Amino acid sequence: MQKVTLDEIVGLERYEKIRDVFRRGIIELKKHRRVSVGDRVIFVFENQETVLFQIQEMLRAEHITDIDKVRFEVEVYNELIPGDGELSATMLIEITDQAQIRPELVRLLGIDQAVSLRIGNQFAVPGVFEGGRSTEDNLSAVQYVRFPLPIEARLAFCDERQDVRLAIDHPQYQAQAVLSSETRQSLAAEL
């Protein structure tokens, strides 16, 4: 999948003019790229468009205009874009009660070792999480995960007869979600 290039980034003034239309398009796109697994965990599968949007929004929020800083952010965010034969997602742990954030994250320590993409009964592809977002006593509520799919798993993923599920099998959190046909079609087009 193509990475975001510096040429695709628009200046803050121009971005303000196109932001509403761009944002609506991304919201529509993400409808088919968002998967809730249980009541606390959401995965949003990334691609070049979703990452471009995140970059533009971050530059807007931080008022970044310096070309070297923009270049740096593009390089950092491009790491979210899946490589060949991969899917990548942002995993969000939703905790709405402020008092429960720390205890809940401690309870879910190790969740980054418990996520897999299951394709039919043949493949259980473990999620590969970005390093540095969890330690033995700390867990970030936002995680970045990749699912490297061997060719056979990619073919099975595209076969509508096979169920595709995101699964979490953690001692404190067990849940699965079947990917909808729309989600699978959106993701399969990028494999």
List each model region and its residues.
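Long, contiguous binding/interaction regions
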Residues: 1-86, 95-191
